[in-house]
Swiss-Prot record:
GO terms for cellular component: mitochondrial inner membrane. Pathway: Energy metabolism; oxidative phosphorylation. Keywords: Membrane, Mitochondrion, Mitochondrion inner membrane. This is Cytochrome c oxidase subunit 5B, mitochondrial. The lineage of its organism: Eukaryota, Metazoa, Chordata, Craniata, Vertebrata.
Length: 20
């Protein structure tokens, strides 16, 4: 996930979203 909590392509594919 990005600094703004937006999931990357990989995270969208896996359903993960890392928020800082």
């Amino acid at each position: 996930g990005t600094l703004k909590g937006i999931p990357t392509d990989d995270e969208q594919a896996t359903g993960l979203e890392r928020r800082t």
